[in-house]
Regions:
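Nucleotide-sugar-dependent
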Residues: 226-267, 273-281
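Carbohydrate-associated surface elements
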Residues: 139, 159-160
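N-terminal pre-catalytic "stem/leader" segment of glycosyltransferase-like enzymes
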Residues: 1-102, 111, 276-279
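Conserved catalytic-core segment of nucleotide-activated headgroup transferases in glycan assembly
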Residues: 162-230
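A short acidic/histidine/glycine-rich donor-binding loop in glycosyltransferase catalytic cores
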Residues: 286-292
Length: 334
């Protein structure tokens, strides 16, 4: 039996979302899988009309070639959502051949209110054909069971691995909070009011519009250079409100394991997380962070943390970081 990781040849960007996919592929390779490319992304040439058609043709050929190599006796690892116009060709071949399939879910668009009938038509037949499906949380598992996916094939990852050999300088307690991500979709940032001596909020990421003078914008960094993040805490929050995680992105946190959680862990930043977020219990049970009901609660929560309590969290988060940096979480299921 051979093992293949189905993947797109893609460049690294400043968006940590692509790092999650790239890291998972590298972890699969370290577990004995071989890469099988079914598509490629060539951004330097994609804006030229004459080359767009050539890229489409190349990707169609790659997908057909990969499909013809599918065998029932082999093991295939794929990551969902599965990009590429031609991916359905590959899915149907996997199902038809009754291949052994392991699926790692990064996002479920129907949980985000983004329902594409053509995706749903192939997604659940593919999930039902899979041998193993790796999800983010207990709530995501429950959702898939409600959709008819057998519970015995579902495994829970909780936190994504984050491959990096970046060295972190030991952190000390302060009232400085970091927030990393796509800042344009983090609408709650517009409404945060930070009083003097409450705390400082450092923001990292693309598309910041300077909407809040109380925020210190620190620019962006390569996802592999996590030591660039300053501060003592990492904030996990999303949506349109500071009172609760609301809206399309906020509601999704009840199911999702944001990649920024893993980023903060390997950066050795104890986490401040919404109490209803899917990973809140995971984080508080392991004493690697604190849970809040609203952004306004941050000053009160920080005022009750001592240096001793903080250093206990740092000790715990170092242990967790060591696992994520070596791909230990995903390897359990490969």
């Amino acid at each position: 039996m051979k093992k293949y990781a189905l993947c797109v040849k893609t460049p690294m960007t400043y968006n940590a979302g692509s790092k999650a996919v790239i890291d998972a592929t590298e972890i699969a390779i370290s577990a004995g899988y071989e890469k099988m490319f079914y598509a490629c992304v060539i951004p330097a040439f994609s804006n030229y009309k004459c080359t767009k058609y050539l890229i489409k043709l190349i990707n169609l050929i790659l997908c057909i070639f990969a499909s013809l190599r599918i065998s029932k006796s082999n093991q295939y690892f794929l990551q969902w959502p599965f990009p590429g116009r031609n991916a359905k060709i590959l899915f149907r071949r996997l199902i038809h051949k009754q291949a052994r399939i392991t699926i790692l879910i990064h996002d479920l668009n129907d949980l985000r209110g983004m329902v594409y009938p053509e995706d749903i038509q192939i997604m659940y037949p593919l999930f039902n054909a899979a041998e193993t499906i790796i999800v983010h949380s207990d709530s995501m598992k429950d959702y898939l069971i409600l959709k008819g996916v057998a519970s015995n094939k579902i495994r829970i990852l909780y936190t994504f691995d984050y491959l990096t050999d970046d060295m972190i300088v030991d952190r000390t307690f302060s009232r400085t909070v970091a927030f990393a991500g796509n800042l344009s979709k983090s609408k709650f940032l517009q409404d945060i009011t930070i009083k003097e001596n409450d705390y400082q909020l450092y923001c990292y990421g693309a598309n910041y519009d300077g909407c809040n003078p109380g925020i210190v914008y620190k620019g962006k960094f390569s996802p592999n250079n996590v030591s660039k993040i300053e501060g003592s805490w990492g904030l996990v929050w999303d949506g349109t409100s500071t009172q609760a995680c609301t809206g399309e992105f906020g509601d999704y946190l009840k199911y999702n394991s944001p990649h920024k959680v893993s980023l903060y862990i390997v950066a050795e930043l104890p986490i401040i997380i919404w109490k209803e977020q899917a990973l809140a219990k995971y984080i508080t049970d392991r004493n690697i962070g604190i849970a809040i009901s609203s952004i306004e609660e941050i000053p009160y929560k920080l005022s009750n943390i001592t240096e001793t309590m903080y250093q206990e969290m740092i000790k715990n988060i170092k242990s967790e970081a060591a696992l994520l940096k070596t791909g230990s979480h995903l390897k359990r299921f490969l």
